[in-house]
Amino acid sequence: MRVGVLGAKGKVGSTMVAAVQAAEDLTLSAEVDAGDPLSLLTDGGTEAVIDFTHPDVVMGNLEFLVRNGIHAVVGTTGFTAERLAQVREWLADSPGTSVLVAPNFAIGAVLSMHFAKQAARFFDSAEVIELHHPHKADAPSGTATRTAKLIAEARKGLPPNPDATSTSLPGARGADVDGIPVHAVRLAGLVAHQEILFGTEGETLSIRHDSLDRTSFVPGVLLAVRRIREHPGLTVGLEPLLDLG
């Protein structure tokens, strides 16, 4: 398969360029970065693209890719329900084209979200702490937002988190994502980390994942690239490719 990389000179993008070059069954067709024309992808006969760019440009990238029948594996964050609806609308006019958008491609991170969803209904309280390098554009992270939504979905019909806080500084209790507090830390020296905390009477449970290097995203991204054609339309999250349900 001929694979292009968008955001090829970024920290994650350059890691993906090296990964595609090292894969015997993949051919690097184009390296595209800020200021480069997207036509480099079509000129190179690109069949699938890995996009690790920026929330400000990713939608324009996807519109171009879908209209040209190029499959997309997207690790760029900032996808709202409205943005996903727009991608579905584009895909409706391009049957057979596939887009996979995932907040995290580290297998361990995907598993931690799955474990959190399973655990959520057994505990009274749940909170999420995500920790990233200070250059990250969005807060909270897409992974933390999705984790909180999965927990909230699993807890439907249960009482809300017990919390007697009546006075606090703005933001002290984190962002509210469907009733789940999410706290974002930005600190030099970090890459990508998340801890999910559960509590009930007499016990707590912590589920933590640490990406210590950006190479942690490679296995998940390459899995998505190799299987993207099996999932026409829009897929959100890596879970369907891991048969997690």
From Swiss-Prot:
(S)-2,3,4,5-tetrahydrodipicolinate binds at residues 133, 142-143. The active site is at 132 (proton donor/acceptor), 136 (proton donor). Keywords: Amino-acid biosynthesis, Cytoplasm, Diaminopimelate biosynthesis, Lysine biosynthesis, NAD, NADP, Oxidoreductase. Its EC number is 1.17.1.8. Pfam families: DapB_C, DapB_N. It comes from Mycolicibacterium paratuberculosis (strain ATCC BAA-968 / K-10). One of its GO terms (molecular function) is 4-hydroxy-tetrahydrodipicolinate reductase. Its main location: cytoplasm. Pathway: Amino-acid biosynthesis; L-lysine biosynthesis via DAP pathway; (S)-tetrahydrodipicolinate from L-aspartate: step 4/4. Belongs to the DapB family. This is 4-hydroxy-tetrahydrodipicolinate reductase. Gene3D superfamilies: Dihydrodipicolinate Reductase, domain 2, NAD(P)-binding Rossmann-like Domain.
